[in-house]
Each structure stands twice: as structure tokens, then as C-alpha cells.
Amino acid sequence: MHKNTHTKPDVNFYDKSGKTPLDWYSDYNATKIVETLIKNGGNVSSVYSRCSYS
């Protein structure tokens, strides 16, 4: 059982899809960056070329 006493994400915990809390956090931030670039008329493809998606 996981106790709710952690002050930072438990990197050893995985959800059903195999993602850790840090994976969710980085995915969320990447989405927000892309949304902001689109709003500002930025080039989204340049962002994706810098990120390595496996």
C-alpha cells in the first residue's frame, strides 16, 4: 500500500498505462507549451523536432 505522506511524486509508482507521475507531469507541460505556441502563432513542428518521442 502507498501512504499519502510523500512530499514528492513516487517515481516507483506506475498507473495502469505504465506511466509514472513524472511522465504525466512532463506530458502535461509539453501539451501546455504547444497550446501556448499555437495561440502565439508559433511553429509547433520545431518543438516536436526537439523532443524525442519513442
From Swiss-Prot:
Membrane in keyword set: no
Per-repeat ranges for ANK: 17-46
Swiss-Prot/TrEMBL keywords: ANK repeat
SUPFAM superfamilies: Ankyrin repeat
Transmembrane feature ranges: none
Record keyword Aminoacyl-tRNA synthetase present: no
Domain of life: Bacteria
Annotated InterPro entries: Ankyrin_rpt (IPR002110), Ankyrin_rpt-contain_sf (IPR036770)
Official protein name in the record: Putative ankyrin repeat protein RC0701
Organism whose genome encodes this protein: Rickettsia conorii (strain ATCC VR-613 / Malish 7)
